[in-house]
Amino acid sequence: MSTGFFGDIQKVKYEGPDSDSPLAFRHYNPDEIVLGKRMEDHLRFAVAYWHSFAWEGGDPFGGRTFDRPWYSNELDAAKLKADVAFEFFSLLGAPYYCFHDADVRPEGRNFAENTRYLNEIVDIFEKKQAETGVKLLWGTANLFSNRRYMGGAATNPDPDVFAFAAATVKSCIDATKRLGGENYVLWGGREGYETLLNTDLGRELDQMGRFLNLVVEYKHKIGFKGTILIEPKPQEPTKHQYDYDVATVYGFLKRYGLESEVKVNIEQGHAILAGHSFEHELALARALGIFGSIDMNRNDYQSGWDTDQFPNNVPEMALAYYQVLLAGGFTTGGTNFDAKLRRQSLDPQDLLIGHIGGMDCCARGLKAAAAMLEDGALSKPLDERYAGWNGDFGKKLLTGLSLDQITAEVETKDINPQPKSGRQEYLENVVNRYV
């Protein structure tokens, strides 16, 4: 049943590259076969509940710009928001969604009331998932917006805050499991510090390690089959966050014995904030064996902060999905649009148009990545570049020779290597030919 919020807009369909309709897909065809699999099953698109339905259009210099009928801290408003959200998922044809607890329920007076509200909304979500076929990609807890978390959640100097956060995560894992969620995400927006003058860094890291171990223990206790994911980000809102980037997260997981239990959810905008490219973070996660899922968006490259815009750069998407395909594709993960409208984009159809453009961009990137993979366009030059390591001497260097023996080989064989071209310009041109 229509809520009326989207007027007479019909379900978005694939019309092909010649379509000029802003409410149709030009490149995203869910049933198109790419590398033997449906495009929908490769991309596994999800809509972010928070940016799409909870964000009000504010910024540090001004308040709300959007006028939505569900903007109040009442249970009835949360129920209306759920109706509109699932109508949107169905219109868009998105197979998944993601949410924080605070996105979907009113803020209660205490933990018990928060949990009761969350469970009431989960009752509604269960019915709507059954009616629409839309599934939950991942759930998470908002451990950063409420003022109780201003000094962190797991890393807070007050053990009562740690306990409240832990109980909240338990309720959110329960909700995620009940809804058939395929992952559970932890993002530490307040897990870090503003100044070392009032921070015991070592203690806070140990607290965070304990917190994550509790999450993993509870996952196994209740039989939750989903993947636990950490989402790296270097700063914002905190000056320095402990989950800075993929490399930092991996070091943290290794220290606390969790590298085989937890993977990463990588956001393009966060990679940029950390001084990396998106494909760098994806490639590193793949190399370290912790690749899990992605949040798709982009940042304004001039502003220097996290703008969470919809993706529109096809070459960037091609290189990102190339790494995803090299990792074997998504298993429990997917492509969550952690992207929001610009605060002047007020109309309901703007929300559809933003997602349509992002989905088309990702589809083009996926197809380009698949073609490069099939043709060996990047892998063949890479194999040639490292071919020497497949020879006898290269293998011995990695497996058996001591430093003395290597030195003897260099002297005996008069090894005097000459540099070879890295062919970067050629490879950049190759990528552009595919997009």
Curated annotation (Swiss-Prot):
GO process terms (BP): D-xylose metabolic process
Record EC number: 5.3.1.5
UniProt-listed SUPFAM superfamilies: Xylose isomerase-like
Location in or out of the cell: Cytoplasm
Active-site residues from the entry: 100, 103
Database matches in PROSITE patterns: XYLOSE_ISOMERASE
Keyword vocabulary terms for this entry: Carbohydrate metabolism, Cytoplasm, Isomerase, Magnesium, Metal-binding, Xylose metabolism
Binding site for Mg(2+) 2: 267, 270, 306, 308
Transmembrane feature ranges: none
Oligomeric form and interacting partners: Homotetramer.
HAMAP family noted in UniProt: Xylose_isom_A
Protein name: Xylose isomerase
Organism of origin: Brucella anthropi (strain ATCC 49188 / DSM 6882 / CCUG 24695 / JCM 21032 / LMG 3331 / NBRC 15819 / NCTC 12168 / Alc 37)
